Design a protein with these regions (language model features):
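Phosphate/nucleotide-binding beta-alpha loop and adjacent structural elements of enzyme active sites
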Residues: 1-242
Length: 242
């Protein structure tokens, strides 16, 4: 029984082509308008479970900041620095409204669903990724996740106020059992994912496998990190971009 967990799906287009490669798929999206689009797109897939909740460290209610570009919406209010920086591209990170959404503890939810192993864990929840992953400690410690593809923020950055999503936190949480393979930006496609072009001591490093990002000079403080369970075969996750 192969399982995909998809946290922060938005309209679900990032992974739609992968759903039929898994026996069960769990999709989480708090924005009610985006959730309605998910229902229309995936209602015919009986193996796909759609959940209209934000993944968090607790079950209940929380404020949710809806941005002009819905992909930037978050449980955290975008920081002034992030909003101003984003304006150089467009005004998509500007908050247009604040709503109340349901929240769940993801680790508890998946245990209640009797999920025994997650083949691919995909998380893009705008600053809450580390907080959510901490609820999965039982899965992590017992090596019950094969591959992880997670939005990550650079150390020292605060993109969403009050949310710590720094790379060093992921490294500490996953370090013993999981290997950091590479970081990517872009969209899902054929071939291996491309790493961010980074500078270390002024030199451009373009190798796909980068083991240490502590000295990265990354203009964009957001990227997506790919982690694999030690000894687990390379799978779909290694080809993903976001």
């Amino acid at each position: 029984m192969s399982t995909l967990v998809y946290v922060g799906a938005n309209t679900g287009v990032s992974l739609w082509s992968l759903f039929d490669k898994f026996d069960s798929v769990y999709v989480f999206e708090p924005d009610p308008e985006m959730y309605e689009q998910l229902k229309k797109r995936y209602r015919q897939f009986e193996w796909v479970t759609l959940v209209n909740s934000a993944c968090s460290d607790k079950k209940g209610k929380s404020n949710f900041y809806v941005t002009k570009n819905r992909v930037a919406s978050s449980l955290g209010n975008p920081s002034d620095g992030f909003v101003e920086g984003y304006k150089k591209i467009d005004s998509g990170s500007t908050v247009i409204k604040e709503i109340e959404v349901n929240t769940i503890n993801l680790g508890e939810f998946l245990s209640e669903q009797k999920v025994s192993f997650i083949d691919l864990y995909y998380s893009d929840c705008q600053g809450s990724d580390l907080n959510v992953l901490k609820t999965m400690k039982e899965f992590i410690n017992e090596k019950k996740i094969g591959e992880m593809y997670i939005e990550t923020h650079g150390d020292g950055s605060e993109i969403y106020m009050g949310l710590d999503n720094q790379f060093s936190g992921f490294k500490k949480l996953l370090g013993e059992n999981y290997n950091f393979i590479h970081a990517t930006m872009g969209t899902y496609g054929e071939g291996n994912a491309s790493p961010i072009r980074v500078k270390i001591d002024g030199a451009v490093v373009s190798e796909e496998i980068v083991s240490d990002v502590s000295d990265w000079d990354v203009p964009n403080p957001e990227w997506d990190s790919y982690w694999r369970l030690d000894g687990y075969p390379q799978g779909i996750g290694s080809y993903l971009k976001s």
